[in-house]
């Protein structure tokens, strides 16, 4: 299982690098308007990173719940990914906040989006910290998998349904 996670991580890293290159090559990464600059940063960098961290935590947590055992390496891997997730989530929140400050017309929708996004992500973080890392393996692996999948899908859905259209409007 560990080898497939490592291979998947490499593949996603290359895909994210290609996404960043697209933003750079198209001039989007350096948009001069603060509101679109920060929203683009969220779409190109922060949100995909959160999605990737959640994906890794989904795999790690599901594995632990399936085996009903938490080894030292798994504990370490989950802890590292939780730390990385918190950094990525902070970057998302900062991008949304800065975009809202730069464009008060976006404030209410971005605050709502931030609240929804944090609520879903925090469900995953809380379960990992309060249950799995403390040796509570009662949750069914499929239920955990589904919970994390909801958070991942929401991050991409909100990006495609709300952030990208907002960026497109700002760039016109």
Residue positions per predicted region:
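Hydrophobic alpha-helical segments
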Residues: 1-172
């Amino acid at each position: 299982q560990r080898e497939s996670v490592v291979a998947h991580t490499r593949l996603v890293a290359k895909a994210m690098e290609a996404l960043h290159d697209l933003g750079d090559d198209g001039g989007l990464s350096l948009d001069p308007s603060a509101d679109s600059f920060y929203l683009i940063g969220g779409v190109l960098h922060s949100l995909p990173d959160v999605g990737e961290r959640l994906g890794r935590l989904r795999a790690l947590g599901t594995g632990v719940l399936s085996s009903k055992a938490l080894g030292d390496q798994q504990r370490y891997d989950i802890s590292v990914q939780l730390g990385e997730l918190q950094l990525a989530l902070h970057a998302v929140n900062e991008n949304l906040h800065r975009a809202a400050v730069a464009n008060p017309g976006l404030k209410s929708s971005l605050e709502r989006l931030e609240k929804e996004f944090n609520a879903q992500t925090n469900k995953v973080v809380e379960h990992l910290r309060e249950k799995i890392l403390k040796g509570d393996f009662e949750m069914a692996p499929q239920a955990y998998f589904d919970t994390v999948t909801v958070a991942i899908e929401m991050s991409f859905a909100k990006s495609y349904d709300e952030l990208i259209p907002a960026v497109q409007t700002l760039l016109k």
